Amino acid sequence: MKLSVCASALNIGKAPAPFMDAVASHGFSGIEFWGWWNYDTNEIKDAATRNGQTVTAICTRFIPLTDPARREEYIAGLRETIPVARSLGCKTIISQLGNDTGDTRARQHQSIVDGLREAAPLLEDAGMTLVIEPLNWRDHPGYYLRSADEGFAIVREVASHAVRLLFDIYHQQITEGDILARILPNISLIGHFHAAGVPGRHELTTGELDYARIIEAIDGAGYNGWFGLEYFPTGDAVSSLDELRAYLTARGVRGE
């Protein structure tokens, strides 16, 4: 499984380049970030080039698609993000969908589908994939998309290879559970994964989830994308990555 380190979580509030150098020296070649506008993207590009790293994902602007009145603003944010992603050699753009507006869920759902259908040609032309992200109800009260099942339905309705789901195992374990029962039948609709220990959003080696089994099953289902490590370490971040690799290796699961 190709492991991608989320620098915005494991190295929160710090300059990216030294962290990128450190994780690269420990054999981790995938790196991702949240809001690119909070970083010197030239610094990220230089570090990735120096280390032979792939920038696996960045976020687009956080503009709600639940509100059709803001769709033009969302598309403008995506138009701004695509060239940044291209400059970083990044093929995946993460999109949150916004809070519940109070309108009916049917109308908000349709607004999201319509907005993503408008966005799809931009992504197809750029050779990039947008991944939409459900979030859990506890950490993100008011957020519209909680259910992976609704997320998969949206992806099917948009009907573009350039729009997929970001399946965040941490969020979905809190919201609905049945992790592999939701992932495996829908593996072709998933463009990226995020993972953290539950509860606490700390290391994958802690908590109630058997991540070695989960990763093995995802790999066995034919997924060939990146598996994002998006957790808040309780100790040294790089040491925690080494511990994760040792845990996976001990269980016979390869992480690279």
How would you name each of these model-derived features?
Residues M1-G27, G89-K91, D114, L145-F167, ...:
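Histidine-acidic metal/acid-base catalytic patches
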Residues A9-N11, G35-W37, T60-P64, G98-T101, ...:
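Active-site-proximal loop/turn and secondary-structure-junction residues that shape catalytic pockets
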Residues A22-V23, A48, T81, A85, ...:
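Generic structural signal for hydrophobic
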Residues R50, L65-R164, I174, G255:
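Active-site acidic/histidine proton-transfer and metal-coordination neighborhood
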